[in-house]
């Protein structure tokens, strides 16, 4: 893995880059590494810039605020179907899981707060199930329709049920 940092006190227009599975992923940060990590996840058709007004706000409140462009969005690589296949929640949640392991964990062992908007909400919830012991809270608003479609899935119900106490409803 590679990690290229331009500035710690982030200017959203001068982002950081991280190489994930051979793809360049763009991300921003505000705040100090040792503070409570928050990852902001954008919705479909958006980018990390969706959260530009939130990063500094939370950084001033003792948080290390991160926002990243999910692969296929914003300034991250836009791989074709031949390179990666279909982009989906599984790929994006693995991207966030690896971001936590490779970018945040070397500097910070605190539990992470995930905040998602629409598609980002689904990614946050899926990542939280995968990293149950590393996630403090999930804030998801609004949830995409895919959550409604998966209501009949017994495995999904059990996975999300055991994480329910960490889920903040808005």
Where are each of the predicted segments found?
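Active-site loop/oxyanion-hole signature of alpha/beta-hydrolase fold enzymes
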Residues: 8, 14-28, 60, 64-115
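Active-site glycine-rich loops that stabilize anionic/oxyanionic intermediates
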Residues: 35, 43-46, 118
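Alpha/beta-hydrolase active-site loop signature
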Residues: 45, 70-74, 145
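Serine-hydrolase catalytic-loop signature spanning alpha/beta hydrolases and amidase-signature enzymes
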Residues: 45-53, 65
């Amino acid at each position: 893995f590679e990690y290229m940092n331009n500035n710690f006190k982030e200017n959203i227009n001068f982002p950081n880059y991280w190489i994930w599975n051979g793809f360049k992923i763009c991300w921003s940060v505000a705040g100090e590494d040792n503070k409570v990590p928050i990852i902001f996840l954008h919705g479909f058709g958006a980018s990390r810039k969706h959260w530009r007004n939130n990063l500094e706000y939370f950084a001033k409140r003792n948080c290390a605020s991160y926002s990243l462009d999910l692969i296929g969005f914003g300034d991250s690589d836009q791989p074709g179907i031949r390179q990666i296949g279909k982009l989906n929640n599984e790929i994006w949640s693995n991207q966030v899981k690896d971001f936590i392991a490779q970018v945040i964990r070397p500097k910070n062992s605190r539990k992470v707060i995930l905040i998602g908007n629409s598609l980002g909400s689904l990614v946050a919830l899926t990542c939280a199930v995968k990293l149950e012991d590393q996630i403090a809270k999930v804030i998801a608003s609004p949830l995409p329709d895919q959550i409604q479609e998966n209501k009949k899935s017994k495995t999904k119900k059990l996975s999300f049920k055991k994480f329910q106490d960490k889920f903040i409803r808005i």
